[in-house]
């Protein structure tokens, strides 16, 4: 699903990533951990084709995201840690997702409800004016409704309360055996039952890669 070979990213004289080699497969649930500055965000941005590597390569389902980003990202659903300041209403954002990804509005609304968000009550509100938890739940719902092969969550529960996190993790359980799930998170204990693999990063390197369960 995702193949990373000899990936390095240099900013000035500093290597944010150093010789990363990873192969992430379908049916895996992977957590990527590390202190701030360990290289986690740079790794995800490189996988998503947002940052061109200094050395090495990335393939998503065999596609180079730096040459065919739209093709590569058609396999990916991504939920960022900090929701972007989108200046669309909640309804308009959902319509955009429906048109661009061919998903059904009813499916997005249904997933929102599973996360205990009645998004219809907030259709007219601008996305950036929703609460942090509402934004996160809506983005999670859109990503899952897309039914991609790969789901990447960057601290997905950061803006969710305990009940919201519980609903989110429950929602992921049936997806475990169907997709590649990647979590960038410090909350390993909360999602331990979902995980099959742990990757630890430090100073731009993958210093530990182990199977779980």
Regions found by a protein language model. Give the residues of each.
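Hydrophobic anchor residue at the start of the ABC signature
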Residues: 140
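The feature captures the beta-strand-to-loop junction immediately N-terminal to the Walker
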Residues: 33-35
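Q-loop/switch helix immediately C-terminal to the Walker
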Residues: 88-102
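Conserved structural motif at the start of ABC-family nucleotide-binding domains
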Residues: 2, 17-19
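Conserved ABC transporter NBD signature motif
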Residues: 56-67, 71-72
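Helix-to-loop junction immediately C-terminal to a conserved catalytic motif
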Residues: 48
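Catalytic Walker B motif of ABC-type/P-loop ATPase nucleotide-binding domains
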Residues: 151-155
